[in-house]
């Protein structure tokens, strides 16, 4: 039997159960799909563009391919580890929540032990990538590991969990900046990180409104559970106003050009549109607000920052 087949059967046994019949029912693509769904690979569109934006803004010219490669590799490792840990730590909560009970770990399709191994391997990948970037990246890695691990516990004791998540993703922008500059001097990297942090926290509050009934009944901490949906949406708006203010400060501090300001205007319009989709008494468009609009926000920022670097008027 080929080595690949043996390896695949071993991984499949560790994941889902114990019988050859179960193995035959799972193709390699199905297993890969299960894992990519668990770590929500499609949500990479939220933070990776901002990590690359930090990389571009901190570079005097366009960054080299090696720097771009190891920055992306570090991001993939960090994000995969964080999402996997979140799924393992929250498995009990997810199992009790009708919206999340069919996720891979609570449904028994992926075993927690294998998921933890994957998380450790992902952190190792992040550390390897960081070792190929400026030394400050490696020196800051323990803070990243701690914060990414810490987030998953916060919904058990504080409604500020959304802010903690925002800071985690804001760290991606700082990581990109350090990968290019080797330091965090001046206001600009912190304004970029603040923009990302408040943006993520704001849309996470909107997303959490879906679980208001469950969170209040099960004593899961969140801004909607603490303040109610209507006030939570107001808090989300305030956070997104801070996002716009931070991006304004970033553009002014770096004297960015016309493309950046086109992106800035687009982001302000899209965030306004996002909040028009969601009402306290109508959450039917939360998914559209969460994924579609916010995906465009991060991509618009990245593309316009890249164009601003390449084309000068």
Regions picked out by a protein language model, each given a short descriptive name:
Residues 33-42, 46, 109, 155, ...:
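Membrane interfacial helix-start motif at the N-side
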Residues 29, 249-313:
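Extended hydrophobic alpha-helices typical of membrane-associated regions
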Residues 32-38, 73, 103-191, 272-279, ...:
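Intramembrane alpha-helical segments
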Residues 1-13:
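N-terminal amphipathic/basic-hydrophobic helices that include classical n-h-c signal peptides
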Residues 50-53, 57-91, 99, 123-127, ...:
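Membrane-embedded alpha-helical segments that form the functional core of polytopic membrane enzymes
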């Amino acid at each position: 039997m080929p080595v690949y087949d043996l390896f695949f059967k071993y991984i499949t046994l560790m994941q889902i159960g114990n019988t050859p019949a179960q193995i035959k029912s799972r193709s390699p693509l199905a297993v890969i799909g299960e894992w990519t769904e668990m770590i929500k690979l499609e949500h990479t569109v939220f933070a990776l563009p901002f990590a690359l934006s930090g990389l571009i803004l901190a570079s005097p010219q366009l960054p080299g391919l090696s720097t771009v490669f190891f920055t992306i590799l570090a991001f993939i490792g960090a994000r995969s580890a964080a999402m996997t840990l979140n799924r393992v730590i929250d498995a009990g909560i997810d199992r009790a929540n009708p919206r999340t009970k069919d996720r891979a770990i609570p449904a028994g399709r992926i075993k927690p032990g294998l998921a933890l191994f994957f998380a450790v391997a992902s952190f190792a990948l992040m550390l390897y990538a960081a070792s190929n970037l400026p030394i400050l990246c490696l020196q800051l890695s323990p803070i990243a590991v701690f914060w990414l691990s810490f987030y998953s516990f916060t919904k058990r004791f504080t409604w500020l969990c959304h802010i903690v998540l925002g800071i985690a993703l804001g760290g991606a922008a700082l990581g990109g900046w350090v990968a290019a500059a080797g330091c965090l001097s001046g206001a600009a990297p912190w304004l970029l990180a603040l923009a990302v942090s408040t943006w993520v926290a704001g849309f996470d509050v909107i997303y959490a409104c879906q679980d208001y009934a469950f969170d209040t009944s099960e004593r899961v901490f969140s801004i909607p559970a603490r303040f109610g949906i209507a006030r939570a949406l107001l808090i989300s708006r305030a956070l997104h106003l801070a996002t716009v203010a931070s991006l304004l400060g970033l553009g002014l501090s770096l004297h960015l050009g016309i493309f950046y300001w086109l992106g800035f205007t687009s982001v302000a319009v899209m965030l306004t549109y996002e909040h028009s989709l969601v009402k306290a008494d109508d959450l039917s468009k939360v998914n559209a607000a969460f994924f579609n609009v916010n995906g465009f926000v991060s991509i618009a920022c990245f593309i316009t920052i890249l164009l601003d670097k390449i084309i000068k008027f």
